[in-house]
Amino acid sequence: MAKGQSLQDPYLNALRRERIPVSIYLVNGIKLQGQIESFDQFVILLKNTVNQMVYKHAISTVVPARSVSHHNSVQHHHIVQTQEMQAEVLAENQTE
């Protein structure tokens, strides 16, 4: 995972998991509203009366309708990253 996504993914996941309504502003000024159904590295699937696949490169701002408790998600994500790094170092040391 890219370093720049270490905040983005847990934040979007918290919005998705808690089904928080969001307003997504595109770089051209268009405002989209709905709930985040899913997302990946390149797109967000926004659900309202219809599903819209929104490319992340077209997004300027994501505004949740209420505050997001993403702190625990971010903290968990960093713990998992640390554990993965420790496992890699341990594996490297065992092969030496």
Swiss-Prot record:
Mind listing the UniProt keywords for this protein, alphabetically? Answer: RNA-binding, Stress response
- Give GO cellular component annotations, separated by semicolons: cytosol
CDD domains linked to this entry: Hfq
Sample GO molecular function, one term:
RNA binding
BP GO annotations: regulation of DNA-templated transcription; regulation of RNA stability; regulation of translation, ncRNA-mediated
The lineage's top-level taxon is: Bacteria
- Which stretches make up the Sm domain? 9-68
PANTHER family according to UniProt: RNA-BINDING PROTEIN HFQ
Family of this protein? Belongs to the Hfq family.
- UniProt subunit comment: Homohexamer.
NCBIfam families assigned to the protein according to its UniProt record, in alphabetical order: Hfq, PRK00395.1
Q: What does this protein do?
A: RNA chaperone that binds small regulatory RNA (sRNAs) and mRNAs to facilitate mRNA translational regulation in response to envelope stress, environmental stress and changes in metabolite concentrations. Also binds with high specificity to tRNAs.
> What is the protein name stated in its UniProt record?
RNA-binding protein Hfq
Question: Whose protein is this, by species?
Answer: Histophilus somni (strain 2336) (Haemophilus somnus)
